[in-house]
């Protein structure tokens, strides 16, 4: 099996901006090839695109899967990835709704706490997901947004679910990230 399913790794996606105007065509090729490989194995969905905005403080485990450091780049490249998967017969699952980019900790091992204001989140991270409110399936994030719900991770928070449904306007199927991750009690 060739990458991305093998142990060999493709170059980190957080370097996509270095491709300049070629980034979109590279993403189309990359995600079209990924779709072809998945279909050849009988797999018809992929937990991609990753729509988190990378920041200098984003945990490296997530950062190398992000498509950019601003919402415009993430939306543009995320849409190319989404469309390439879908047009090649794969159901894309957007993630990590409503945004994981502010997290400086890996949710596989602990619950990341985001201290950004609700206003900043709505204008940036949540705005990326609003641009994809037409998606059929999304995966939630195990991240605690202190300004919105200081007690529950987004994946278990009624307040965050209300934001996802009412502010982001996502009406599709919402699935949880892995519930065995240490971020959840």
Question: Could you say what each language-model-derived stretch is?
Answer:
Residues 76-86, 90-185:
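Second-shell residues forming the walls of enzyme active-site clefts
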């Amino acid at each position: 099996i060739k990458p991305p399913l093998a142990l060999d790794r493709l170059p980190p996606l957080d370097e996509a901006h270095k491709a300049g105007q070629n980034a979109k065509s590279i993403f189309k090729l990359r995600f079209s090839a990924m779709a072809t490989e998945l279909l050849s194995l009988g797999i018809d969905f992929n937990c991609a695109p990753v729509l988190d905005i990378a920041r200098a403080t984003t945990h490296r485990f997530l950062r190398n899967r992000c498509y950019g450091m601003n919402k415009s780049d993430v939306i543009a490249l995320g849409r190319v990835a989404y469309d390439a998967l879908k047009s090649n017969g794969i159901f894309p699952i957007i993630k990590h709704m409503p945004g994981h980019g502010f997290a400086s900790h890996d949710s596989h091992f602990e619950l990341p706490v985001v201290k950004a204001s609700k206003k900043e989140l709505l204008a940036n991270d949540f705005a990326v997901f609003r641009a994809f409110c037409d998606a059929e399936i999304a995966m939630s994030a195990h991240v605690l947004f202190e300004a919105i719900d200081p007690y529950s991770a987004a994946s278990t928070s009624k307040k965050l679910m209300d934001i996802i449904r009412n502010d982001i306007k996502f009406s599709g199927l919402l699935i949880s990230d892995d519930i065995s991750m240490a971020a959840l009690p």
